[in-house]
Amino acid sequence: MTTKKPAPHALRWWIGLSALMIVALDQGSKWWAESTLELREYHPVIENLLGWRLIYNPGAAFGLGSGMTWILTLVAAVAVIALVVVALRTTQASFGIGVAGLLGGAISHLGDRLLRDPGFGEGHIVDFIDYAGFFVGNVADIFLVLSAIYLVVLSVFQKEPPVLTPDERPADSTR
């Protein structure tokens, strides 16, 4: 049984719209957290395993690099650009799923860095999902982690590597 590959332009639209939905979900959940939760106050959802705790993270995962917000902003911008290039070149829907998750999470984090306090390029990430006191994250983090895991698993079990088109220009030999 063969699966029909989507047209490249349809796949690109799907990846882009999926990424934008992830951004909307992440930013909407952050709006909810900021309008509902008190800073650093814990609200259990599942005992002490999972809860809500609003914090503003100037760094990366686990608060690392908190003094290097501009560098993290540049890394996020480069990641978004690279993921857009990959999204435009991918031809496999299975690969596109992972790219969409990474792109949505990266765009949302870049938006936080650029638009949130304390200022442009130095914005703090809004985190509010507390995982048993080990770390606090957000919806974008969930998509970033699950998409990365998905792509690793896909690369291990997929028979053919993901196909990335260099460009859609005809080759020199066909002119």
State the predicted function of each range.
Residues 1-175:
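Alpha-helical transmembrane bundles and membrane-interface segments of multipass inner-membrane proteins
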